[in-house]
Regions:
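PLP-dependent class I/II
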Residues: 1-162
Length: 162
């Protein structure tokens, strides 16, 4: 689903040795019976139409995501927020500890004060404290605007601490 920007559809497939597939199927069968029918048809169409165009539009999509990712990483650097470079999803996970806010405080205030949504790192476990997850699965101009707003917010928070 990621190659075709079908975010949230939870579609995918596995290529693995037969014995591993058998084990994976046991887990899968007790987790979910199958993906929703609409999702299966959408995934099938994505694969069919992608094959017809040699995945040219997928390559363009990858370039677009890379541009958005670069916008975010460059913005974090300007803000003084360390962030590892993501390599497999549409999310960044910057460290916000330097702001003095918890992940929850940062996410709530950023939403309330700048209308920018992010997910507190603690949503992914205790070790996520001090981080937030931000998505770049949206239009490039929206990513740039969100980063400008986040920078204003971070500057305001840091100024208030001094």
């Amino acid at each position: 689903s990621k190659a075709f920007a079908m975010t949230g559809w939870r579609m995918g497939y596995v290529c693995a040795p037969k014995e591993l597939i058998k084990i994976m199927l046991k887990v899968h069968q007790y987790t979910i019976m199958c993906a929703p029918t609409a999702g299966q048809y959408a995934a099938l169409e994505a694969l069919r139409s992608g094959a017809d165009t040699n995945y040219a539009y997928v390559a363009e999509m990858v370039r677009a995501y890379d541009r958005r990712r670069r916008i975010m990483l460059d913005a974090y650097e300007k803000m003084g927020l360390h962030c590892f470079e993501p390599r497999g999803a549409f999310y960044t996970f910057p460290c916000i500890r330097s702001t003095g806010l918890t992940s929850q405080e940062f996410a709530e205030r950023l939403l309330r004060e700048e209308k920018v949504a992010c997910v507190p790192g603690t949503a992914f476990g205790e070790s996520g404290e001090g981080f937030v997850r931000c998505s770049y699965a949206t239009a490039t101009d929206k990513v740039a605007e969100a980063m400008a707003r986040m920078q204003r917010f971070v500057e305001r928070v840091r100024d208030a601490r001094t």
